[in-house]
A protein has these predicted regions:
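Helix-to-loop junction immediately C-terminal to a conserved catalytic motif
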Residues: 48
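The feature captures the beta-strand-to-loop junction immediately N-terminal to the Walker
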Residues: 33-35
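Conserved ABC ATPase "signature" region
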Residues: 97, 110-128, 153, 158
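Conserved structural motif at the start of ABC-family nucleotide-binding domains
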Residues: 2-4, 17-19
Length: 252
């Protein structure tokens, strides 16, 4: 379980996060949703220890994030941010092997190579595994980055807007892969998602934020109602049942 207690953050006098406390359940996909400026990515940055907490605490299975040694954290938590600074002159296969670095420390084993090859297959990257990142489309590069994160083999995976640069087909395909791997490997995946239909279809748990606070949380079927979406986004929608999932239809 990820335990977040009394986390606040301000820029000047403006609250970005306002005393956020929540428990993210162990296992499955938890989607962080909400309008722009709700505080989702800021909360993500604290959960990923990309910036130091100003107040409150975050713990993974009871272990305080702030006190966890970096080497241990790299084998516990893997992250993908919106902005990634991985060098471009690297092949897809080498990028995925870079995700194994916390284990091989520059000397890849046969097990590391096997994990990389399996990830290339799972994320449909074999056809350009030896191409440089500069030679890939934005969507292909995004899939490669997420595959690298999963190669890290951590119990916790944090993804900030993983569907960036992906068309409808590849966004759905990626969410199906994430759901499959999360379940098979018994991982806990937390993803910031702007597409609430993807969250409704693939998340096991939803945390909805607004104005720096947790507005509501629970199962997708309980969160994605017309009334709740009106509260979150201040817009009218219809919520349909489609193939046992909620489908949110915007009024145009």
């Amino acid at each position: 379980m990820i335990t977040i207690r009394n986390v606040s953050y301000r820029i000047g006098t403006r609250p970005i996060l306002d005393n956020v406390s929540l428990d993210i359940p162990e296992g499955g996909i938890t989607a962080l949703v909400g309008p722009n400026g709700a505080g989702k990515s800021t909360l993500f940055s604290f959960m990923a220890r990309l910036r130091p907490l100003e107040s409150g605490s975050i713990a993974y299975r009871g272990k305080n994030l702030a006190c966890t040694p970096t080497a241990e954290l790299a084998r516990t938590l893997s992250i993908l941010t919106q902005e990634n600074s991985i060098m471009s002159r690297i092949t897809v296969r080498d990028l995925l092997m870079f995700g194994r670095y916390p284990y091989h420390q520059g000397r890849p084993s046969e097990n590391d190579k096997t994990i990389v090859e399996e990830a290339l297959a799972e994320f449909h990257l074999q056809d350009f595994s030896d191409r440089y990142l500069t030679e890939l489309s934005g969507g292909q590069r995004q899939r490669a980055m997420i595959a690298m994160v999963f190669c890290q083999s951590t119990d916790y995976v944090l993804l900030d807007e993983p569907l960036n640069n992906l068309d409808m087909y590849h966004a759905r395909s990626l969410m199906q892969i994430l759901q499959k791997l999360t379940r098979e490997h018994k991982r806990t995946t937390v993803a910031v998602l702007h597409d609430i239909n993807q969250a409704a279809a693939y998340a096991d748990h939803v945390v909805a934020m607004k104005n720096g606070k947790v507005a509501m949380q629970g199962k997708p079927d309980d969160i994605f109602t017309a009334a709740n979406i009106k509260t979150l986004f201040d817009m009218d929608v219809s919520v349909l049942d489609h193939q046992s999932k909620k489908l949110i239809v915007h009024h145009i």
